[in-house]
Amino acid sequence: MDGSAHPNPGKGGFAVVELDDDNRVKFCHQEQFEYTTNNEMELRACLYALIYYGHRYHLFVPIVYCDSVYAINTLTNWKNNWKRNGWIKSDKKIPENLTIIQKYDIIEEKGYQIELRKIEGHKGILGNELADALATGRMTEQEVMRKYG
């Protein structure tokens, strides 16, 4: 999965890509936005992955690879502390992208789970490269499925 905005803030998008054991694309999804931030798109990608994979693979916790330290920290390290403190950060400010974070939290409370794992972006990792191409609009879902599906 990946999210992007260019310029930041500016036009952006996010994408989620699922590969099979042979590195063929089983599933991909992209959404584009006229005005957004990079961090918002990374969080939206995580939210989409939680909904999609949490519903589809409810008998185990799927691993989702993410190149955003911000998204991983927000959803795995900071979110629960902010929630305990009334959705206020330690600096007494409201977290950016709070509505997305709260939606993620609500869906997790319903039992949906994913494990977010950090990967390096732009290092030739096929799933991440395809998600980046989709998030930035360089490729469409149809092009990815035709070429890599």
Name these PLM-found stretches.
Residues 42, 46:
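Short, conserved alpha-helix that lines the donor NDP-sugar binding/gating region
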Residues 4-8, 47-130:
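RNase H catalytic domain
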Residues 1-41, 51-55, 133, 137-143, ...:
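RNase H-like nuclease fold core
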